Amino acid sequence: MEMQGQNPFTNFATMHWADVNGNHVSFGGNLSSPTSYASGFHTYAVERTSTSIDWLIDGVQYFQGNIANGINNTSAFQGPFFILLNVAVGGNFVGSPDSSTVFPQEMLVDYVRVWGN
């Protein structure tokens, strides 16, 4: 899940992996909101099964990635995962900061919950 500071009305779900030749592949979708996601707390979830990865906001699924049987070289998604929460500045996804960039920025997290079956 990713958001862009200059676009707080859209949340992105993207899978990133390498194809059989080692080239970067990405596949994703997004969910737009009439109000800024930054205006209040939301429940974000990523649920993985042996066949799919689902992205949800406030209980509503907005993207699903198929990883069944390692389709399209997605077998890496069957292995262990880790959670990374961060605020990044710059890069290819959002571009470099400029005079309109607001600093400082913050990410408020109420809780993180992990469970398995």
Annotated model-derived regions:
Residues 1-117:
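GH16 jelly-roll
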